[in-house]
């Protein structure tokens, strides 16, 4: 590209006039071009030269486009560059990477002289702006690079993290290559090699994306992951698909790059923002001290003398929440010495005590585990966890890698304990107060998916590992059994609530028998809620919450009565009727009038609807006549979502037509309860939501739903419903 642009320049400006220069900037200035990258150039000029050669420059630009170069061009004087750079961090960043292509060499030298730190963007201000820019970029990606469709360039741990380090180094030292940083002592040889290897890997991934898509593409979408994995030579094996193996390498690479980004920015901060001599130092214990707002080891050999201190430093961070992080040199020691966490250290009572104490402490646990994972300590101490680091779950539901998902589940269990998050799940916030040992819930969360990716039943394998871990770490047999049971059964409550009829007394009796006692029900309910919420934000809604809460409450009643005295159907029906009857009497209905309407329906109707729903249905059911059918009611019920109730004569195709109408209206059907009466009518209830989980607008959508259903169900024999819903791109890659 350099040679092409120089040739085009020479064609239209053969005399190479003074006062004009062609300069590469941005990624092109860094000499980082991929097949479909933007080619960013700067036409640097003096005012009189631009006027003299305007026509030739316009021809140069037009010809570049004509021959297929995707050129992004700016035209500026040196004064323009200085003014724009002073106002915008992105402009100064772009110009830092300026590289002369052809033309008057004096101009780029004068521009660089006008942009030195003593004139615009002092080193400290530049560094702080770049840190803020990176933090904002991280927030855009929810502070994780481990989502299942990452951006190779912009996600945390991506190429932009390497660029950020280079920009800060260039601003501070005048040169920003990795080799320069190594020569200046900011990088060890191993760190430099890791950065080069990670950068090369991500470049190759981006190159593959450009070749596969035929355009600029930086996101590793599901469409492309399989093809890129094939280009990298991966094939399916007994345990993991090729795409999962490739993506695990990707996630582990960005994890390494993210650690090095942390390390280098911390080193820069210490070098740029102040002298160590000015920071107050106070001892924390014989191995660690506080320097300013950071923790550091007292010398370079701490972890080699006491490898268990690799856990102690994180425990100290947990005990001293005002500490902002780990000093750079100590972080470098952690990255260097984490390999010392071998079987001997894992058996050391000091290591075991420190690790389990983090869970008993509770406060700061999530942040600590994330740090330990980020710096490789968690996977070293728990080899089973190390195996799931970066492991993707190529399915319709999970949005994070297994290790990130597990840590989000731990986070959710911790949030149940915190008053400031009580409004997220008020019922769970109340249940968690009854736990005698919350640390057992956190351990269940940590181990619940730790055996994924090995083949076999991950719940069974994980339960065995959890029990061994708990006993090794000094927990009682009863506590170890509880954690193992939680891991083994962590899917049971979700599957029961979503795939079985929780209004059926037999379902409740069976589930209660498997749970056995109220305390286990509390733990399992909380783990289930935390797990679903961490799997995919779109999976959690008021309907699922209500199902789990209903299952919890009915099971709690069954356990309180005793497993030998299960709830009977007639008792449940009588209770529901009594509560609904009271609601209606309070509204002015008579008992005889209520019972007369209800006589048309059998027990299933009362078992499958709440008292509030029965009270809502009643006035319409009392007034309905053959001429007014089909009866269609729509209402948003507290904590259950939007309910659509249909009452009409039983005829063929009603279910297909009803669901077809709802699908055509762009609604997701979350639940369907279908009931046929003994006198030939149907009572069908659907719980629906917008596809993006937005609340359904009563003013617009309720009349639309009612009108469309009544229109189609009025003549089901001749009605047809065609549904043509766009399939989200993610679903196209799975068998559904």
Describe the role of every protein-language-model region.
Residues 96-150, 501-517, 521-551, 555-558, ...:
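Long, amphipathic alpha-helical stalk/connector segments used for oligomerization, subunit docking
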Residues 1, 38, 64, 162, ...:
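Conserved structural-core and active-site-/substrate-pathway-adjacent residues in large, well-folded domains
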Residues 2-24, 31-33, 37-398, 467:
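Non-catalytic interface/linker regions that flank or bridge core catalytic/transmembrane domains
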Residues 68-73, 82-85, 338-359, 414-420, ...:
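Conserved catalytic alpha/beta cores of large enzymes that bind or transform nucleotide phosphates
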Residues 88-91, 494-497, 690-697:
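Short, charged/polar, Gly/Pro-enriched secondary-structure boundary elements
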